[in-house]
UniProtKB/Swiss-Prot annotation:
Substrates-to-products reaction catalysed: Exonucleolytic cleavage in either 5'- to 3'- or 3'- to 5'-direction to yield nucleoside 5'-phosphates
CDD domains given in the database record: ExoVII_LU_OBF (cd04489)
Major localisation: cytoplasm
NCBIfam families found in the cross-reference section: xseA
Gene Ontology CC entries for this record: cytoplasm; exodeoxyribonuclease VII complex
Entry protein name: Exodeoxyribonuclease 7 large subunit
EC number: 3.1.11.6
Keyword DNA-binding included in the entry's annotation: no
InterPro entries hit by this protein: Exonuc_VII_L, Exonuc_VII_lsu_C, OB-fold_nuc-bd_dom
Gene name linked to the record: xseA
Domain of life: Bacteria
Length: 449
């Protein structure tokens, strides 16, 4: 019989391990309410204590990285609410609780309800970003749902008056604390939606304890905010206070004053933006005008470079350069002849026979005279040819022709008119005179006889 049950026999270690795994996996994380006793804190910083009620008790441990977040010092006999994991200390087989968080019993129960409602609404999708409505920009009317005697209303109105004095504000007074507060807040939200006077709502109150803010952790308020067709900004308590309303609202503001900042326009900032825009517009206009001025100057210079007078000036410059080159050529010829004469004289002087010298001198004088006359004749001839070339160039210049009373006519596409077959009656032609242009219409065309 013993051998048939061998597979069901546990060692002590295996038994404790199995029980620990069952406790951790099946129980998970739980909330435990009880009274603290035997509280100790050794040098390690961990807390060890017992939680008990009238009929039972359980050993608990809370490690340093968890207990440092507890905002109060636990006392013997104090009622607390602990969020913990159930486990077993295997070496001794001791069943114990490992605490993760601790709160005084009153706030602890509220916190437990808060966590349960938060998980429920989150599972339903009320916190999803896809349901968030965008705030109007700018807002044309702001609705405020809060106590008419609270500091929150004073803070909101003060900020709105400072930032945007012309912004209309409608107050929906309601209780924000007490048993009647959730119902009044819901009715105020529904009334604002029914009247449709505002395009954004601020729902909130000033700071307080968890009990003071509990109206904004009410499920009815959360669902009313979610159902609102008007975007809702939650502004409950201080920045560290987070309520269910904050998760459901379209936007959470850390304080009522911050909510007023969010929904209003800063008129001074708006004025600065307008002035900045005007300055940028002025700079853009200055740049545009300067750019167009540069473009005009470029076109003007290009037209000047294509003017007929400028072309004539370039031709005159080229003619002057040609004249200078001809002068330089003549001077070079004279210099070469002089040098040749000097060389001949030198050779003759070296031979020394007097008769030959006299004859050579006579011959040289004749050659010199003839050379001089020849050079003068050639120079005169070149000057005459140069003068004729200048006269010819001036004679064939279009401006000279126009000065003699002639005109040049062109068609509208710029072609010079040479024959009557290039135009027909009714065509427009342009005629160039010495001092300007004429535009005329062809009345008739008569062939020459």
């Amino acid at each position: 019989m013993l051998s048939s049950q061998t597979s069901s026999i546990f060692t002590v270690s295996r038994l404790n391990q199995t029980v620990r795994l069952l406790l951790e996996q099946e129980m998970g994380q739980v909330w435990i309410s009880g009274e603290i006793s035997n509280f100790t804190q050794p040098a390690s910083g961990h807390w060890y204590f017992t939680l008990k009620d009238d009929t039972a008790q359980v050993r608990c441990a809370m490690f340093r990285n968890s207990n440092r977040r507890v905002t109060f010092r636990p006392q013997h006999g104090q009622q607390v609410l602990v969020r913990a994991n159930i486990t077993l200390y295997e070496p001794r087989g001791d069943y114990q609780v490992i605490a993760e968080s601790m709160q005084p019993a009153g706030e602890g129960l509220l916190q437990q309800k808060y966590e349960q409602l938060k998980a429920k609404l989150q599972a339903e999708g009320l916190f999803d970003q896809q349901h968030k409505q965008p705030l109007p920009s700018p807002a044309h009317c702001v609705g405020v749902i809060t106590s008419k005697t609270g500091a929150a209303l004073h803070d909101i109105l003060h900020v709105l008056k400072r930032r945007d004095p012309s912004l209309p504000v409608i107050i929906y007074p309601t209780a924000v604390q007490g048993d009647d507060a959730p119902g009044q807040i819901v009715r105020a939200i529904e009334l604002a939606n029914a009247r449709g006077e505002c395009d954004v709502l601020i729902v909130g109150r000033g700071g307080g304890s968890l009990e003071d803010l509990w109206s904004f952790n009410d499920e009815r308020v959360a669902r009313a905010i979610f159902a609102s067709r008007i975007p809702v900004v939650s502004a409950v308590g201080h920045e560290t206070d987070v309520t269910i309303a904050d998760f459901v609202a379209d936007l959470r503001a850390p304080t009522p004053s911050a909510a007023a900042e969010i929904v209003s326009r800063n008129q001074q900032e708006l004025l600065r933006q307008i002035q900045s825009a005007q300055q940028r517009l002025g700079m853009a206009m200055d740049y545009y005008l300067a750019n167009r001025s540069r473009r005009f100057t470029q076109i003007f210079h290009r037209l000047q470079q294509q003017h007929p007078q400028l072309r004539l000036a370039r031709q005159q410059t080229a003619l002057e350069r040609l004249r200078q080159r001809m002068g330089f050529a003549l001077e070079a010829r004279i210099k070469q002849a002089t040098q040749r004469q000097q060389r001949v004289s030198q050779r003759l002087s070296q031979q020394n026979p007097q008769p030959r010298i006299h004859r050579a001198q006579s011959r040289i004088q004749q050659l010199e005279y003839r050379l001089t006359e020849n050079i003068r004749s050639r120079l005169s001839e070149q000057r005459e040819r140069f003068g004729n070339a200048v006269t010819h160039l001036e004679a064939v210049s279009p401006l000279a022709t126009l000065a003699r009373g002639y005109t040049v006519s062109t068609t509208t596409d710029g072609k010079v008119l040479k024959k009557i077959k290039q135009v027909n009656a009714g065509d427009i032609m342009t005629t160039r005179l010495e001092d300007g242009w004429l535009e005329s219409e062809v009345k008739s065309v008569t062939p020459g006889t």
